[in-house]
């Protein structure tokens, strides 16, 4: 079993359920450099979340939760999806990835939707899915919110100064 560590998280692989065979067949791995299936994320030796797949490239990482039926998906609460998204962001940042994506994939789902602010897609769309990565760096997100706020308020010069600060921060992160 593979184990990756980045304080305070440890990622460990687990056994693969047979119900995930369809999921693996539909998974698009053309864009990534590596994949781990069935990963348990532990924080301080306590399992906090499981992901059915983690895919990564040079600077981005994607976390996937798979449900093998719409009924199993309905049992997944919005709060839990938000927690899984938050853990994904923290793990991505801890492992040094600049951007991340978390998505829920459901076998038998009719159309894409969202739950807890996270994209939920049918399994049949997974093969053509191009991840929409977002920043794992909280400070950049906050700067984006401030830029939008001051742009709406008509404070164009201040928004431009914040944009310069954002670019400086991005260069230092590179």
Question: What kind of region is each of these model predictions?
Answer:
Residues 1-174:
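Intrinsically disordered, low-complexity Ser/Thr/Pro/Gly-rich regulatory segments
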């Amino acid at each position: 079993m593979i184990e990756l560590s980045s304080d305070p998280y440890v990622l460990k692989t687990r056994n693969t359920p047979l119900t995930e065979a369809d999921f693996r067949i539909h998974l698009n791995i053309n864009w990534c450099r590596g994949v781990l299936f069935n990963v348990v994320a532990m924080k301080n030796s306590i399992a906090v979340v499981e992901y059915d797949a983690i895919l990564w490239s040079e600077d981005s990482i994607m976390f996937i939760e798979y449900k093998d039926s719409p009924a199993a998906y309905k049992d997944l609460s919005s709060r839990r999806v938000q927690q899984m998204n938050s853990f994904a962001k923290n793990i991505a940042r801890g492992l040094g990835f600049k951007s991340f994506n978390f998505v829920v994939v459901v076998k038998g789902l009719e159309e894409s939707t969202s739950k807890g602010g996270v994209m939920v897609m049918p399994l049949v769309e997974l093969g053509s899915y191009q991840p929409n990565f977002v920043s794992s760096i909280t400070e950049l997100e906050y700067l984006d919110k401030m830029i939008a706020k001051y742009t709406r308020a008509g404070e164009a010069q201040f928004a431009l100064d914040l944009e310069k600060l954002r670019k400086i921060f991005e260069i230092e992160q590179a």
